[in-house]
Amino acid sequence: MQNVRDWQWSQPAPQALGLVPMVVEQSGRGERAYDIYSRLLKERIVFMVGPVTDETANLVVAQMLFLESENPDKDIHLYINSPGGSVTAGLSIYDTMNFIKPSVSTLCIGQAASMGAFLLSAGAKGKRFALPNSRVMIHQPLGGFQGQASDFEIHAREILTLKRKLNELMAAHCGRPLEDLERDTDRDNFMNAAQALEYGLIDQVLENRAAV
């Protein structure tokens, strides 16, 4: 297996971030330049930035699978700054977090809303973090549909099934009764980092790196 220090896969930078800084490293074979996100991926840091889409999920899943192949016994760190997005895309990340051997630590930087909050809560127990001024928001799934009346009924059943499934999973991660999640996700429910800790969505608020 190739050593993690020698791999050359370039991580696609999160979209809409403008100019991406480059980092130049010296080695015995000369200089090598990385975009900053690829360099951080070498440290097993994966960024989930912006809306959760199929494209975002595919990139996050691919990076987690790659890091597992490099070292299946070392933690992966998922940094989340997301307003949420597609339920099915988010669940593909969630299932991969549970499928792979490494523990996945989660850290909220900025915001973790909707599916972002769900994935934040799904990190390995004891390894779910948020920075002091980050925001977390939970709510029920949103959806829209156009079509025949009979199709409306089918889609309504599906979204209700997803709602219950997400509430059951989050209740387990938060250590709370299902009834709490059903009540607290009925409308947009915003929390600061301390409130997210009290609710059970995270395990620790990180004031600085020394607190890890």
UniProtKB/Swiss-Prot annotation:
Catalytic reaction list: Hydrolysis of proteins to small peptides in the presence of ATP and magnesium. alpha-casein is the usual test substrate. In the absence of ATP, only oligopeptides shorter than five residues are hydrolyzed (such as succinyl-Leu-Tyr-|-NHMec, and Leu-Tyr-Leu-|-Tyr-Trp, in which cleavage of the -Tyr-|-Leu- and -Tyr-|-Trp bonds also occurs)
SUPFAM superfamilies: ClpP/crotonase
This protein's record includes keyword Zinc: no
Keyword Cytoplasm applies: yes
Key words, A-Z: Cytoplasm, Hydrolase, Protease, Serine protease
NCBIfam families: clpP (TIGR00493), PRK00277.1 (NF001368), PRK12553.1 (NF009205)
Subunit-level organization: Fourteen ClpP subunits assemble into 2 heptameric rings which stack back to back to give a disk-like structure with a central cavity, resembling the structure of eukaryotic proteasomes.
Name used for this protein in its record: ATP-dependent Clp protease proteolytic subunit
